[in-house]
A protein has these predicted regions:
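P-loop NTP-binding core
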Residues: 1-203
Length: 205
């Protein structure tokens, strides 16, 4: 059964999509079968893999709402060994449309649990907020990888995210583990970068 890694941080501009793209591509290059799922309405991971996010018929939005089959949503071999479930701005409406659905936190889990048999890794690029899409990702994931910038406010956001992860683990997904943090835009010449890195060494990969 494949591992499902959610790349998450509710703060924008910390390198989530870049981390998700590079992690997916590196695993694929090592011969692992990888599925990247773009859960951000901005669609940066989709664009990053060279897919026209405005020119695709079926995306994660249609899949979550039951308007498309999984097989019709997956873009095959965007890179060798790497498939993609794309996203675009339509996904921003999913939050409202999922409100009245029972067990809405488990919709993505129902999809990814079936896909785990086909892939070694499923990488979830989460949106920059702790909304229902991120809760779906954390409920589906086996672990969480958190990209953070080495700045003061990033630490504040990490505390909030860890609290959310703990709540999801307690109530929705007991298997969820903290994979670690990845320091992005790290500059070893600055004291702040060094202080942040030392403070969170116990969480890093």
């Amino acid at each position: 059964m494949g591992r499902i890694i959610a790349v998450a941080n509710q703060k924008g501009g910390v390198g989530k999509s870049t981390t998700a793209i590079n992690l997916s591509a590196c695993l694929a290059e090592k011969g692992k079968k990888v599925l990247a799922i773009d859960m951000d309405p901005q669609g940066n991971t989709t664009s990053g893999f060279g897919v026209d996010k405005n020119g695709i018929e079926n995306t994660l939005y249609e899949l979550l709402l039951g308007e498309a089959e999984t097989k019709d949503t997956i873009v095959k071999d965007v890179v060798e060994n790497l498939d993609l479930i794309p996203s675009n701005i339509n996904l921003s409406g999913a939050e409202i449309e999922l409100v009245g659905i029972d067990d809405k936190e488990f919709i993505l889990k129902g999809i990814t649990d079936k896909l785990r048999r086909k892939y070694d890794y499923i990488i979830l690029d989460c949106p920059p907020s702790l909304n229902m899409l991120t809760i779906n990702a954390l409920t589906a994931a086996t672990s969480v990888l958190v990209p953070i910038q080495c700045e003061y406010y990033a630490l504040e956001g990490l505390s909030q995210l860890i609290h959310t992860i703990d709540l999801v683990k307690e109530r929705l997904n007991k298997r969820l583990k903290m994979e670690g943090v990845v320091f992005t835009m790290y500059d070893a010449r600055t004291n702040l970068s060094l202080q942040v890195a030392v403070s969170y060494t116990h969480l890093t990969l």
